């Protein structure tokens, strides 16, 4: 024991190994380094065996069974703190905007094809939901749509004649009637399709214009309407004048014809009279 105390007294400036290990660990983990307490070279108090044994117990890994944070060595505690900080830094999540954004556009700004696609998707989704509800036994309502409004705008005359009804007549007449009916139905379908396409195009063109352009178009239409009405009035007046002139001319011509006929008859009578008188005069000297 005395030899051991003499060794410690002989090297008072040498720090204990536990302090060296703790300084290394604190330097690696980024914790502030604490300067060790200066030892008095004059030999104030040498290290006692109790302190040395305590430091040796802390240096031994797994002292006290290795259970609990208080029973661990300073190196183990420092490593645990470093691992916890690294785990927190690794788990830190920064929210970033999604790369795939859905740009919503109002229905009025969509083109006709995009409107058709959206309506088709909505109808398919509604049909799928209705099928799921029907499979679960829940009451299902009809799909809500505004197509009936468009149908009411162009009402068609009902077909009072049933398709299976037979008409009296020959087979040729029935075939001709069927072909005429099919051609009429095809023509009506084409006319309706053209009207719908024209209405869609006109609606899209109006929706794409500003308020000033719409006002300017409205004033232009009013000006053209007034010009058309004035032209129609002038044509009606001209037609009335042309219809009145031929009648008047016909009456004048008829009167002229009647006057000429009367004059011709008078001249004919005078000619006959002069011929008779000339014949009489020619017969007297010869007798």
From Swiss-Prot:
Residues 1-212, 266-287 are annotated as: Disordered. It comes from the Eukaryota. Residues 208-278 form a coiled coil. It is found in: Nucleus. The modification Phosphoserine is found at residues 31, 53, 55, 73, 78, 83. Residues 227-287 are annotated as: Interaction with CCNT1, HEXIM1 and HEXIM2. GO terms for cellular component: cytoplasm; nucleoplasm. Residues 142-145 are annotated as: Interaction with P-TEFb. The coiled-coil domain mediates oligomerization. Transcriptional regulator which functions as a general RNA polymerase II transcription inhibitor. Core component of the 7SK RNP complex: in cooperation with 7SK snRNA sequesters P-TEFb in a large inactive 7SK snRNP complex preventing RNA polymerase II phosphorylation and subsequent transcriptional elongation. Belongs to the HEXIM family. This is Protein HEXIM2. The lineage of its organism: Eukaryota, Metazoa, Chordata, Craniata, Vertebrata.
